[in-house]
Amino acid sequence: RATPRARPPRRMSVSARLLSPAALPRVTPAPRRGGRSDPPRARRRVSASTTGDDAAYDRARLEADASAMRAQRERMTDALERRNADVDDAARDDPHGEWKWAIRKRIWDRMEDTNVAQFPRPVHHRIPNFVNADKAAANLTALQCFKDAECVKVNPDTPQKAVRRAVLEAGKTLMTPQPRLRTGFFSVLSEELVPAIAADAAVLKKCCTSAGVASHGVPLSLNEMRARRCDLLVIGSCAVDVKSGARLGKGEGFAELEYAIMRMMGTIDDSTLVVTTVHDTQLLDGGEIDTRRLLRHDVPVDLIVTPTRTIWIDKAAQPAKPEGIYWDILSPQKLAQVKVLRDLRAEVEAELGETLPTGPDETLPPLAVRAEKKKMREASRGGGR
């Protein structure tokens, strides 16, 4: 194992002052063991799987996913119809990046048509799973940047399942968000926190799933998140440009939110490597994504790993990474949907003594409606059948 690295001092620009709660009182980090700050073990793991009914948890999660996908499908259809209208696309105002939908659809269609897509299918409106995703994961784990990392944040999507397993098998700490930040914040797992990971293959396999994270993972509070350092970020993508590292997700913006929150908390900084594992079919020719059309919160990657290639992005061609949460473009609907954003906003406003700006309204997939919250609560009690 690599020697734990000292946490570098954070450089705070004037503009980032409003984006980050760096001036808020810092909690005293918990005693470090093995270079990590561990949350209290006695803390209850609140999840839909605390009763052990993983099937109920998965049913509730999949129902919420299906609802979100239906809304995203309608959003894509509307965006493509507007693009096909007799309007000069180059001159048209596109504040929400609707041009991205044409690229997403092309990649999703190609993966299905060539049978590169893997379960769950169809891959439309998902971070698409692909043939040989495990080989892409193996190529990543062979790199020095992975070997040196002690804590690795990995998205909860299916194509990165092998990466999550590799993190745990290597004795590292896995940090992963709740899907869509819908039921919580970030959780961590490791052999130290869950000794059965090293002794029981079934537990290891389960901990690589969303239900396993919910039942075995230790949720982090905001203060515990501030006390941690993440060494490597692995995110899923729909498509990625091999020249600039510009990437497209499935269109909900949660990878960008997760990155912004981690930057704001000081868990990562601009130098933290961002990696995506994708199939070669998902690669876009250099320059196919016009970086001038990217939005402020879009997160580029530093490294692309496929089953056959490892592509390092030239910093000179890479767009800037977000510095934190841009409150002025964050809609009231997104704030209402994600509790951790409301908590962070309240902290910053209390520190500054002023109200932060809010972005324009938007229509979101129905992830936070009361009916689905009720289903998740029923699942946590073993019901919801």
Predicted regions and their residues:
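Arg/Lys-rich low-complexity patches in intrinsically disordered regions that function as generic
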Residues: 33-36, 40-44, 370-378
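Extended, H/D-rich, highly charged conserved domains that either
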Residues: 152-180, 185, 194-195
